[in-house]
Every structure is written in structure tokens, then in C-alpha cells.
């Protein structure tokens, strides 16, 4: 009996200045699927002395970590492994000593990449894992360097690696471990001085959106969500977190709701750098990218990926993996879009992301049926909130889950979420449920002609009297849906011509 061959594994290892990371993925159903993530805090940059020589202790921390990584590499083809060193290994004058033993431990060569190459690879990781359109400014704050990239689609237009990071700024500006206004101001002003040479060229190129691709940005988002804020980072929120940090006098005693102990040590220094970037470049807002350097390395090894629309690729991969009815999901999406346009896509639901989430929910709402029909909505919600979905943020995944949880039968109010406004999420849920009812026969030729009109929160769906008479089951279900929406304060009228 023949055995099915598992898809090959790929490993990307990033020997960073603060942490060493390993990402193990496989290529399946047109997507890169994460199989393992391993991270160890080594704080390599903290081992650099005034002459940029790495201490034996810092090198030993790195070697100990690589001994753990080596076990995981044994089962991965050599051609599917990429290992890179970044800022601290670029800087260390005794890097050859570290690399010689590191190569022996791993059994593979380590490539110490330039700052520009690091920036280019980071951008690839962002482009392959983050949704949205337009020109991006990408910010990645590492342990000893900060990469700044402007790009559009898969093409980078400006690449810069700056010699500042959360570990080096910690040792330089918070050496006394005091969280004072003076230390914060010194760290922020020093970061601005480091950024100044690129200010004119970057503002001349310009950007439409800004994304952060670092542990610092991830930590900030976790804190904001824990404190009931949305996931969008703004200057006001950064200054608010600075004030929270300064309540504690000493860094070792720092406690902020949502901040993990692991991230606490380099949080003030990373926060200072990000505040400087926001102020000098006059950034309005920033969101978290879906990936960065390691993801860029992984996607470079899998040369299939050139599709521009990351979200479309993700949806296609999920539909294939879970054997979904693609024709029907497309039918629901088309009807949902028609209903949205009739309601007023730019007025009744004004947020562009709401339309994206409606389309995605329409195409993936039946994913839970692969587990069980009875609780299909619950299973859909769980899967969409927990699957790796490149192109969608955590808040967007949460919103998708709550929409698909309620795609049929019993209707309850939506809980608070941070992807779009409560009004928009409520309205696209109403449209999703109507689209599913109008397409339940799963054949576009059997769809009725319909017209949806709105009066603020009141919906009126008009259909042919003859069609309703010829389709009594659908007519009854629409009447039930009218009662369900109206009962929770979402008035829905079904009228016939």
C-alpha cells in the first residue's frame, strides 16, 4: 500500500540581537502553513563592549540556543533551510569566533546579511502576510537596528537600516534602569537624531499606510487590547503608555496591564524609538504586520508566491484545505455585495474594511461544516479566530469569527470588537444573513430579484409576490429572519410587489 508523502518542511532562522527565532513551515494548498515557532531570548547585543567585541557569556547564550535549534533541523532538507545573522553579528569584531562554533553546532552555514538585505527581506515578509493596498511604510525595531522600508505591492522603493534598537537603546539611555522623564526624553531625541538623515527622502516618497513588524509593536498591541483599546497604534496611545511606564520608578518593577514579563525589560527603549518615529515622520497610525524577516526568508524559499492579493490567496487556501463549496461561497459573496451596494456601500457602511470582512465571511462561513452541522457556526467562529490567516489582523479574525458564529438560525447581538465600528459590524452581519437565505438553493439561476432599501437602521427587502408564493420555504424563513432581527432592535421588513 502506497503512503502519502508529507509536504516538505522549510526552516528560517533569525539570529537577532535580542532573540533567536526559528520558524518551521510547510507549503500546502497554495499557502505557507506555520508548523512550529521557537524563540529564545539571548540578548546578544547586550554582550557587546565599547569596542564592539562580543563577550564569551553572550556567545555562550547564543550557542546554547542553537543547540536546541539543531535538533529540529535534522529532519529538514538542507536546501530548505536559511539561517541569517543581523545587526549584532554585523557589528561584532569577533564574529568569526561565534560563527565558527555556531556552524559546527548547526551543521549549516550562517549568512550574516547586510542591513539593506535585512530590510528587503523584512518587506517581503510583510508583503506576503499583510493585507491592504497602497504604499506602505514598514517599521521593524530590532535589538540593535531599526529597519525602515517604503514599498508598494511586492516592490520596495526605499530601504534603510539604522543603528538603533531596543537593546542598544536600553543600555545607552536606561542604563541606570530608571524610568524618568529625562531618560525617556534622551532616548526619544537620540532616536530622532538617528532618523534625521532619512527624513527628507522618505517624506518625499510618501506612504499611504504604516505597519510595524517588530516585537515592540506586537507588545504595544497586546497591551492596548488588554486595556480595552482597539488595535490601531497612535501617538496619543504611545504617550499614554509612556505615562503608565513612568509611574514605576525602576524598570525591574515595571508593571503595565497587558505587558508580559518577557518583554518588560526592553519595552521602554522600544517605546521611545517608536515615539520618535511617530513624531519625526508625523505618522497618524500604525497596525501590526502579519510577518517580517523570518516569513520573508520562508517565502523566498517557496518561489510560487507572486499573487498580489494576499487575502484572496488566504481565502483560496482555506477553501481548498477544508474542502469548501467554492461555487456556493462565491454566490453568497456576490449577493452580499449586491445587497451592500443597494444599502449604500459608501454611506450605510462607510468603512472599506467592512466590505472586505463581509466578502470574507461570505466565502468562509461554512468552514465549520467540515466538523459538524449542528454547531456549524460555533465551529466556523473557532476556526476563523484561531487559524493563521495571512492578510488579516487578530481583530479582523475575531470579527470574522463573530460574524460566522451568527450566520444562520438564532441571532444574538455582537460582542465588542476592534476591527470596525459596532454599527458597521452589525450591518454587515444583517446583510450576510440575508445573502445566505436568498441563496439557500445554491444555484444562481434560482435566485430571486430583490431590492434592499435603508432608512438609518431600518431595512426593507422587497421581492416579487409571485416568487414568494412559488418559494414558500424561503418566504417563511425570511419572515422568521424579519422577526429575529426586529426582536433585537434591528428592524427588518419583508415586502412584496
Curated annotation (Swiss-Prot):
Keyword annotations: Hydrolase
Q: What superkingdom does the record give? A: Bacteria
Q: Top enzyme class of this protein?
A: hydrolase
What would you give as a GO molecular function for this chain, any one?
A: guanosine-5'-triphosphate,3'-diphosphate diphosphatase activity
> What reaction is this protein's catalytic activity?
guanosine 3'-diphosphate 5'-triphosphate + H2O = guanosine 3',5'-bis(diphosphate) + phosphate + H(+)
What Gene Ontology terms for biological process does this UniProt record contain? guanosine pentaphosphate catabolic process; guanosine tetraphosphate biosynthetic process; nucleobase-containing small molecule interconversion
Query: Which Pfam family would be a valid example here?
Result: Ppx-GppA_III
Note the Gene3D superfamilies from the entry. 3.30.420.40, Exopolyphosphatase. Domain 2 (3.30.420.150), Hypothetical protein af1432 (1.10.3210.10)
Keyword Hydrolase listed? The answer is yes
What EC number(s) does the entry state? Answer: 3.6.1.40
What does the record give as its pathway? Purine metabolism; ppGpp biosynthesis; ppGpp from GTP: step 2/2
Has keyword Hydrolase?
yes
Family stated for the protein in its record: Belongs to the GppA/Ppx family. GppA subfamily.
Extract the NCBIfam families matched here. Answer: PRK11031.1
Function (record text): Catalyzes the conversion of pppGpp to ppGpp. Guanosine pentaphosphate (pppGpp) is a cytoplasmic signaling molecule which together with ppGpp controls the 'stringent response', an adaptive process that allows bacteria to respond to amino acid starvation, resulting in the coordinated regulation of numerous cellular activities.
The name on file for this protein is Guanosine-5'-triphosphate,3'-diphosphate pyrophosphatase
State the organism named in the record: Vibrio atlanticus (strain LGP32) (Vibrio splendidus (strain Mel32))
Amino acid at each position: 500500500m502506497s503512503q502519502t508523502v508529507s509536504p516538505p518542511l522549510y526552516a528560517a532562522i533569525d539570529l537577532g540581537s535580542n532573540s533567536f527565532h526559528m520558524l518551521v513551515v510547510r507549503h500546502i494548498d497554495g499557502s505557507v502553513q506555520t508548523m512550529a515557532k521557537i524563540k529564545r531570548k539571548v540578548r546578544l547585543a547586550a554582550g557587546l563592549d565599547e569596542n564592539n567585541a562580543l563577550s564569551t557569556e553572550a556567545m555562550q547564550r547564543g550557542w546554547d540556543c542553537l543547540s536546541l535549534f539543531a535538533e529540529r533541523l535534522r529532519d529538514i532538507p538542507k536546501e530548505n533551510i536559511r539561517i541569517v545573522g543581523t545587526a549584532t553579528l554585523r557589528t561584532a569584531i569577533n564574529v568569526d569566533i561565534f560563527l565558527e562554533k555556531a556552524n559546527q553546532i548547526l551543521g549549516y552555514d550562517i549568512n550574516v546579511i547586510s542591513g539593506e538585505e535585512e530590510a528587503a527581506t523584512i518587506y517581503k515578509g510583510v508583503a506576503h502576510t499583510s493585507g491592504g493596498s497602497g504604499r506602505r511604510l514598514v517599521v521593524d525595531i530590532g535589538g540593535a537596528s531599526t529597519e525602515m522600508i517604503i514599498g508598494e505591492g511586492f516592490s520596495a522603493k526605499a530601504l534603510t537600516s539604522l543603528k538603533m534598537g531596543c537593546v542598544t537603546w536600553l543600555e545607552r539611555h536606561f542604563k541606570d534602569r530608571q524610568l524618568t522623564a529625562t531618560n525617556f526624553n534622551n532616548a526619544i531625541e537620540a532616536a530622532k537624531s538617528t532618523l534625521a538623515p532619512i527624513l527628507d527622502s522618505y517624506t518625499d516618497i510618501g506612504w499611504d499606510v504604516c505597519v510595524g513588524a517588530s516585537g515592540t509593536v506586537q507588545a504595544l498591541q497586546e497591551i492596548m487590547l488588554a486595556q480595552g483599546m482597539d488595535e490601531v497604534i497612535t501617538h496619543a496611545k504611545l504617550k499614554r503608555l509612556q505615562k503608565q511606564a513612568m509611574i514605576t520608578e525602576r524598570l525591574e518593577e515595571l508593571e503595565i496591564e497587558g505587558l508580559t514579563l518577557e518583554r518588560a525589560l526592553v519595552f521602554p527603549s522600544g517605546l521611545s524609538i517608536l515615539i520618535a518615529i511617530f513624531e519625526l515622520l508625523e505618522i497618524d497610525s500604525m497596525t501590526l504586520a502579519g510577518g517580517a524577516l523570518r516569513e520573508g526568508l520562508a517565502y523566498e524559499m517557496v518561489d510560487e508566491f507572486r499573487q498580489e492579493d494576499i487575502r484572496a490567496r488566504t481565502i483560496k487556501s482555506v477553501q481548498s484545505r477544508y474542502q469548501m463549496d467554492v461555487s456556493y461561497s462565491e454566490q453568497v459573496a456576490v449577493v452580499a455585495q449586491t445587497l451592500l451596494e443597494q444599502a449604500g456601500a459608501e454611506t450605510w457602511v462607510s468603512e472599506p474594511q467592512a466590505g472586505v470582512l463581509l466578502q470574507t465571511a461570505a466565502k468562509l462561513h461554512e468552514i465549520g461544516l467540515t466538523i459538524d452541522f449542528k454547531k456549524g457556526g460555533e465551529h466556523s467562529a473557532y476556526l476563523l479566530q484561531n487559524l493563521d490567516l495571512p492578510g488579516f489582523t487578530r481583530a479582523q479574525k475575531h470579527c470574522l469569527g463573530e460574524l460566522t458564529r451568527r450566520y444562520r438560525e438564532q441571532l444574538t447581538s455582537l460582542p465588542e470588537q476592534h476591527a470596525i465600528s459596532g454599527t458597521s459590524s452589525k450591518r454587515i452581519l444583517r446583510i450576510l444573513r440575508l445573502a445566505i437565505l436568498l441563496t439557500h438553493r445554491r444555484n444562481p439561476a434560482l435566485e430571486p430579484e430583490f431590492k434592499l432599501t435603508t432608512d438609518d437602521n431600518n431595512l426593507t427587502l422587497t421581492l416579487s409576490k409571485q416568487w414568494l408564493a412559488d418559494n414558500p420555504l424561503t418566504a417563511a424563513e425570511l419572515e422568521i429572519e424579519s422577526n429575529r432581527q426586529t426582536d433585537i432592535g434591528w428592524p427588518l421588513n419583508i415586502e412584496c410587489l
